[in-house]
């Protein structure tokens, strides 16, 4: 009987622990991505120029009163920091997915974005694994 009570105690403790742990809300994800005054991230998001050359992004997220949506700027560059193009976008997080609505009508979706330390992770809708690094300051791109 003592053994059964012991197992019941363990089972109830596990259930209680699981019920108190929850998934991150859209607002929490948004704040992790945009911070209080905006955050800039750098890395590869799976984009290429028309000739197949990889493009890297300096992408800045800012939010207003609500941290689950806001506006942003993306500077796509070549690896040597030569500027390819600058894009403006609106962004929002819905049900854990990050939607970027570019001013040219293109929508880019990042599934289950997360922030761990100085890194932003997510999966693009085409399966590309995104890993961006947080950079101090709003834009550190070398002006070539």
For the regions a protein language model found, what residue spans apply to each?
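Bacterial N-terminal signal peptides that target proteins for export
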Residues: 1-9
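Hydrophobic helical h-region of N-terminal Sec-dependent signal peptides
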Residues: 9-17
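Lipid interaction determinants
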Residues: 24-86, 97-144
